[in-house]
C-alpha cells in the first residue's frame, strides 16, 4: 500500500487505516458486534460505511466488555475510499454518537494488525474510596464506601505480578483461550485523596482478568487478605477463592503499544486540520456524507 501527498491511499488495492478511539462504555454492550445490542464496533462500522460506501470490518487491540471504557483503544479497517487521515477523523466524528470519539488516524501497511502487532495493552482501574459519593466521578470509578482501603498494601500485592506467569486464578469462565499465560510488565497503585488508580500493563489480558484482579485486591486493601495470601492464591491458580469481580465502570483501556507508533509520524495533528491544502479528491463532498448540522467546537458482584 502506498500513500499520496495528503496521506490518502493510492487507488488500487484497499488501504488499511488505523484509528485511536475513545468511548464511554456505560451505554454499550462491549466492543464486539452482538445482534440486537448497541456495541462500539457496530457504531464505528455504520459510521464508516456511510463515508466509504462499502462494507467494512473493524479489528480492535482489545475487545472490551460491557460497561468498560477506553481512552486509548486502537482499531483498524480496510477501505478503497481515498481520503486523508484528518478527513477521516473529521468525517467520522461528525457521524458518531457523543460517547465515541476518533482521536487520531494513520495509514499503515497491509501486514499491520491492531490486535496481533500490539506489544502490550494497559488498563487502569479507578476506585472512589469515600463515605460520600461524587456524582462526577462515579460513572468512571467503583464507589467503595465500605472501609478505607490500604493503597500501600494493594501496591505490595501488585508487586508480585510482573513476569511471565499463569494467571488462571483471574480468568473468567467461558474463555476460549487455550492457555492462561500472561506477561505482566508493570503493575502499580497510586492514591490521590479519595481516588485510587490501579494500572497494569501486559502483553495480553485473560477474559475478565482485570475485574477479578481488582476484586482480589480489594480484599487485600480492606485487610481481609494479607499480601502473602493474595500471592499464594494466584500463584497456585486457586480460582475458587477469587469469588468476586469488581464492577465494569471503573475499568478503562488507556493505551496500546506497538513496535512503531503509527500515529507518531503518520497520524493527524491539530496543525494539519483545516489547512486548505487537501487535494480535491481527499475532501468530503456533499455526496460523501448525509446532510448533518455541524457540531460546535467545543458493588462488587458475584461472578457467574
UniProtKB/Swiss-Prot annotation:
One of the GO BP terms on file: tRNA pseudouridine synthesis
Record's keyword annotation contains Ribosomal protein: no
Active-site residues, Swiss-Prot/TrEMBL: 65 (nucleophile)
Matching Pfam families: PseudoU_synth_1
Basic and acidic residues bias: start-end ranges: 289-298
Transmembrane residue ranges: none
Region of interest (Disordered), residue spans: 274-304
Keywords of the record: Isomerase, tRNA processing
Superkingdom of origin organism: Bacteria
Keyword Iron belongs to the record: no
Gene3D superfamilies the UniProt entry points to: Pseudouridine synthase I, catalytic domain, C-terminal subdomain (3.30.70.660), Pseudouridine synthase I, catalytic domain, N-terminal subdomain (3.30.70.580)
Quaternary data: Homodimer.
HAMAP family for the chain: TruA (MF_00171)
Family indicated by similarity: Belongs to the tRNA pseudouridine synthase TruA family.
Job description of the protein: Formation of pseudouridine at positions 38, 39 and 40 in the anticodon stem and loop of transfer RNAs.
Protein name as it appears in the record: tRNA pseudouridine synthase A
Originating organism: Gloeobacter violaceus (strain ATCC 29082 / PCC 7421)
Amino acid at each position: 500500500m502506498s500513500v499520496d501527498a495528503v496521506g490518502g491511499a493510492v487507488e488500487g488495492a484497499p488501504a488499511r487505516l488505523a484509528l485511536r478511539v475513545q468511548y464511554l462504555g456505560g451505554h454499550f454492550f462491549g466492543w464486539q458486534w452482538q445482534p440486537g445490542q448497541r456495541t462500539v464496533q457496530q457504531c464505528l462500522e455504520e459510521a464508516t460505511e456511510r463515508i466509504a460506501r462499502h462494507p467494512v470490518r473493524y479489528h480492535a487491540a482489545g475487545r472490551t466488555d460491557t460497561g468498560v471504557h477506553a481512552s486509548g483503544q486502537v482499531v483498524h479497517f480496510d477501505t478503497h475510499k481515498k481520503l486523508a487521515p484528518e478527513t477521516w477523523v473529521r468525517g467520522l466524528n461528525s457521524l458518531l454518537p457523543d460517547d465515541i470519539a476518533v482521536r487520531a488516524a494513520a495509514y499503515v501497511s497491509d501486514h499491520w494488525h491492531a490486535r496481533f502487532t500490539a506489544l502490550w495493552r494497559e488498563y487502569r482501574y479507578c476506585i472512589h474510596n469515600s463515605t460520600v459519593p461524587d456524582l462526577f466521578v462515579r460513572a468512571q470509578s467503583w464507589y467503595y464506601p465500605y472501609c478505607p482501603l490500604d493503597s500501600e498494601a494493594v501496591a505490595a500485592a501488585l508487586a508480585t505480578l510482573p513476569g511471565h506467569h499463569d494467571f488462571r486464578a483471574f480468568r473468567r469462565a467461558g474463555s476460549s483461550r487455550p492457555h492462561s499465560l500472561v506477561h505482566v510488565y508493570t503493575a502499580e497503585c497510586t492514591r490521590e485523596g479519595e481516588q485510587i488508580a490501579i494500572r497494569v500493563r501486559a502483553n495480553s489480558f485473560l477474559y475478565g482478568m482485570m475485574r477479578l484482579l481488582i476484586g482480589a485486591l480489594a480484599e487485600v486493601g480492606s485487610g481481609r487478605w494479607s499480601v502473602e495470601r493474595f500471592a499464594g492464591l494466584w500463584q497456585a491458580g486457586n480460582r475458587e477463592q477469587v469469588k468476586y469481580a469488581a464492577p465494569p465502570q471503573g475499568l478503562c483501556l488507556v493505551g496500546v503499544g506497538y513496535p512503531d507508533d503509527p500515529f507518531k509520524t503518520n497520524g493527524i495533528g491539530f496543525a494539519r486540520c483545516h489547512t486548505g491544502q487537501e487535494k480535491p479528491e481527499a475532501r468530503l463532498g456533499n455526496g460523501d456524507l448525509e446532510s448533518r448540522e455541524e457540531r460546535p467546537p467545543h458493588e462488587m458482584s458475584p461472578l457467574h
